[in-house]
From Swiss-Prot:
The keyword Heme does not apply. Minor capsid protein involved in virus transmission by the vector Polymyxa. GO terms for cellular component: viral capsid. Keywords: Capsid protein, Virion. It comes from Potato mop-top virus (isolate Potato/Sweden/Sw) (PMTV). InterPro entries: TMV-like_coat (IPR001337), TMV-like_coat_sf (IPR036417). It is found in: Virion. Belongs to the virgaviridae capsid protein family. This protein is translated as a fusion protein by episodic readthrough of the termination codon at the end of the capsid protein. Readthrough of the terminator codon TAG occurs between the codons for Ala-176 and Gln-178, thereby producing the 91 kDa readthrough protein. It comes from the Viruses. GO terms for molecular function: structural molecule activity. The gene is CP-CP2. This is 91 kDa readthrough protein.
Length: 825
């Protein structure tokens, strides 16, 4: 079955697809030569500059026949079908190269002094001077060609590899062992730029054929370009934020003029390269805005600190002073924290150790790894655990170095080692690992191509016979000609043990081939697999074909999801924009409102009111407010409504006096009441007065009299409510509810003045004209008792003549009705 597959592959003709007349004309006209052969020939000519004149005919023939046309054709691949790796070729049709070679040919043709004769004339020229003239001219032209081989623009335009030339001209090689088509997401321009970047890096490091292998001094390397060159392998692996188009103008050739018989070479200054950036630059804009915001925050923190302090001093005791003082304190705290953090970082930088052989130190090293190849020194007083960590760091660095240097044999093992160390010490995938993995997978793919390709010194028939004679199942290895993608992916090659036998070397090579294929297919669906797609030219095993199909399916699904998400993202961006605009408006309004509040209402840092402006506004609006009615207390009592400020429901003064008498009688002994009822003649005013005095002395007066500052105060309980009377000894006592006073301890006395206006009830003894308002008809206690008891009115001299006596009488009772008199606020 394998033989039939080989016959079918051999039946497919190797050729270029899309070959047309234009491609045929290019192949017939263009002359190519390998870069190493051309540089070696050029070095020989420069070392034997004087001998060139002696062998002018031979050298002229070499220069004239340099390179060859029909370097490739429809059925002959550019550079050869069995090419492995990157081999450089120079196009001799490039304008500057063609002009330099023509000048060398002209100089060699004038060996007999023709060039000097043209400048000085035939009389002054001699035949033996032509060699010196031609040798000098040839030396200049050879130096120019040597400089041209390392020129940046020349490397981009006239130096090609097999892949670069096919990508530039749109050629696609179709054969039995090659890919028939490129992936639809393959970026040709990015692949060409990747090859050019490698050429430029090799020229800067003096690694091109013919360059000196040593450089005086240190070599400056642009690590940003180097990282991009390492990451972009065979395609546009890393997505670019900005689309860059390079607009380069070709170098103008030196102009040769004849002035006064002398040939003068005029070199024009090359124009600078113009690079235009266009495309989606939103991430760069956001980065710039964040940088600008950071600068504004830092500057505001530094500048506003002093400004807020001055503001807090100026506004002390004024509106906004308290808020300014708090903001100044917050700014001082923030500045102190920034200074402390900066001092801590500086101290850490000063005391930074060469290495930190601890799990935390290695984790920090792996997190901040920047492709440095500095190894930790294991010599020192370290324990076993620290030495193991140092060994892991050295192993990691050496593995990355081997991958970076392009060691194809160790690429798979080094990548496995790097993965193992990262998985052990980090719980995430760092960004730089994509660069390492892309380069390693590319090297593994190139090695797989070489292992599957022809062997030097062994013909194809013999190689196929050896492969057919080897049976992988005998060594416990999977058969790549029949196993599927899942089988090779899930096969554990670590358990395979190669025993002693006749096919040990072949079994080990087959095992390495299986490991390389496993390493390649592990990157299916990632950007690293693009390197496999673009560079794999080995046999199309079933697992390889399934891997390509699976990767294509995954990318199509992602592209479809990306298109669907794009529409949703547009809607989300619009909604976010509206919300941001609304938030900005709300923040602006809130800021204005807060500023007005801080200006008008915020309390100052001193004793002044919070806002004199607000007070003036209230004073201006006061005349327009409705004024309260000026009514007397009796007018309010006569209204058919009750108020919570009244002491009780309003009643007739006679009823109130009768109630007082009844309350007094209730405290009298029942035997006295019965005696007075049986013998009313004994109940004279003197007897009643004596009885009343005895009762009052027995119970004690519930009235406390305090005289602070000449004002007599009386505290009494009326209907369960505590009252305080001011100016009780005058004709106009003032009654105050004690609940309206400030709550203070009894030892500190009564605080005068801190009560509500509506709680003050002035009382005038000279009341309105009623049954008891006339001075001649003021009732005595005896009369009150007589009225309350229903007896006849007696005679006595105990009368209520002022407010103090009335309050004392009222205070001696358990309950009190409404007082008679004029009550007003």
């Amino acid at each position: 079955m394998a033989e039939n597959r080989g016959e079918r592959r051999a039946a497919v003709e190797n050729r270029y697809d899309a070959w047309d007349h234009e491609q045929a004309m290019k192949a017939a006209v263009r002359k190519f030569i390998s870069y190493d052969q051309f540089s070696a020939q050029l070095r020989n000519w420069r070392e034997a500059r004087l001998n060139i004149i002696e062998h002018a005919t031979s050298v002229l023939s070499q220069v004239s026949n340099l390179g060859r046309t029909h370097f490739y054709s429809r059925t002959e691949r550019f550079g050869g079908s069995s090419l492995v790796g990157d081999k450089l070729y120079v196009c001799l049709n490039e304008t500057r190269m063609k002009t330099a070679l023509n000048n060398i040919i002209v100089a060699l043709q004038t060996v007999n002094g023709e060039g000097r004769a043209r400048r000085l004339g035939p009389r002054e020229a001699s035949a033996n001077t032509g060699g010196e003239d031609s040798a000098l001219n040839v030396a200049h032209q050879l130096a120019e060609v040597d400089d041209l081989l390392t020129d940046e623009s020349f490397l981009r335009e006239a130096v090609f590899t097999q892949d670069k030339y096919e990508l530039v001209n749109g050629l696609r090689w179709a054969g039995a062992x090659q890919l028939t088509a490129q992936a639809f997401w393959f970026d040709v321009n990015a692949a060409i730029d990747e090859i050019d970047n490698r050429l430029l890096a090799a020229a800067a490091l003096r690694l091109l054929p013919g360059q000196a292998n040593h450089v005086d001094g240190l070599v400056s390397i642009n690590y940003a370009q180097l990282d991009r060159a390492l990451s972009v392998v065979g395609g546009n692996i890393l997505p670019q934020t900005l689309e860059i188009t390079r607009d380069e103008r070709k170098r103008q050739l030196p102009e040769v003029r004849v002035i006064d018989g002398e040939r003068v070479t005029i070199r024009n200054k090359d124009e600078a390269t113009v690079i235009r950036n266009h495309g989606q630059g939103l991430p760069w804009l956001l980065a710039f805005l964040l940088l600008l915001l950071s600068v504004v925050v830092v500057y505001s923190t530094i500048y506003l600190n002093d400004w807020l302090y001055r503001l807090s001093v100026v506004r002390h005791g004024k509106p906004g002073g308290g808020a300014a003082r708090k903001l100044s304190g917050m700014s001082d705290w923030l500045c102190s924290r920034l200074r402390a953090r900066g001092a801590l970082n500086v101290n850490r930088m000063r005391k930074k150790q060469a290495c930190d052989p601890s799990p935390t130190g290695l984790r920090k090293f792996l997190t901040c790894y920047n492709f440095s190849y500095e190894l930790w020194d294991p010599t020192g007083s370290y324990d076993d655990a620290q030495r193991r960590i140092i060994a892991e760091q050295n192993s990691f660095v050496e593995a990355v170095r081997a991958i970076d240097e392009g060691d194809r044999e160790l690429a798979e093992a080094c990548l496995t080692n790097v993965r193992r160390i990262l998985r052990r010490h980090l719980n995430y995938r760092p960004d730089y690992f994509d660069i390492i993995e892309a380069k390693a997978v590319y090297l593994v793919t190139v090695l797989t191509n070489a292992m599957s390709g022809p062997v030097v010194g062994v013909d194809d028939d013999e190689r196929r016979a050896v492969v057919a004679a080897f049976n992988p199942s005998d060594c416990g290895l999977p058969n790549l000609d029949s196993c599927s993608l899942d089988e090779i992916k899930n096969f554990d090659l670590s358990e395979v043990v190669i025993g002693e036998g006749t096919n040990v070397e072949q079994a080990r090579g087959y095992l390495n081939l299986c490991r390389n294929i496993q390493c390649m297919i592990e990157t299916i669906g990632t950007v690293q697999f693009l390197g496999v797609l673009s560079s794999y030219t080995g046999p199309q095993y079933p697992c390889i074909s399934q891997a390509f199909a699976e990767d294509k399916r995954i990318r199509k699904e992602r592209l479809k999801d990306k298109d669907n998400i794009t529409t949703a993202d547009i809607i989300a961006y619009l909604v976010s924009g509206v919300m941001v605009a609304y938030a900005l408006v709300a923040v602006s309004k809130g800021g204005i409102t807060l500023f007005k509040f801080m200006k008008n209402y915020a309390g100052g840092g001193g004793d002044r009111p919070g806002s004199s402006r607000r007070i003036r506004q209230l004073e201006a609006a006061l005349p327009s407010l409705p004024q309260p009615e000026e009514l007397t207390m009796m007018e309010r009592l006569r209204r058919p409504q009750s108020s919570d400020n009244d002491l009780a429901l309003r009643r007739n003064p006679s009823d109130m006096l009768s109630q007082v008498v009844r309350d007094v009688v209730a405290d009298v002994d029942s035997s006295d009441i019965a005696e007075s009822l049986n013998d009313p003649a004994r109940m004279t005013e003197a007897a009643l007065e004596i009885r009343l005095t005895r009762i009052m002395s027995a119970e004690g007066s519930p009235v406390d009299v305090i005289e602070p500052g000449g004002q007599e105060l009386i505290s009494m309980q009326v209907h369960g409510e505590s009252l305080t009377v001011i100016n009780a000894g005058t004709d106009s006592p003032t009654v105050i509810r004690s609940a309206s006073l400030s709550t203070r301890h009894r030892s500190s006395g009564i605080e005068i003045g801190s009560f509500a206006v509506d709680k003050v009830l002035p009382y005038e003894v000279e009341g309105e004209n009623d049954d008891h308002g006339d001075a001649g008809k003021k009732p005595t206690v005896a009369q009150a008792l007589m009225i309350g008891g229903g007896a006849v009115k007696g005679q006595g001299n105990l009368g209520v003549t002022n407010g103090k006596e009335l309050l004392k009488v009222l205070g001696s009772s358990r309950s009190i009705g409404k007082m008679s008199g004029k009550m007003a606020v």
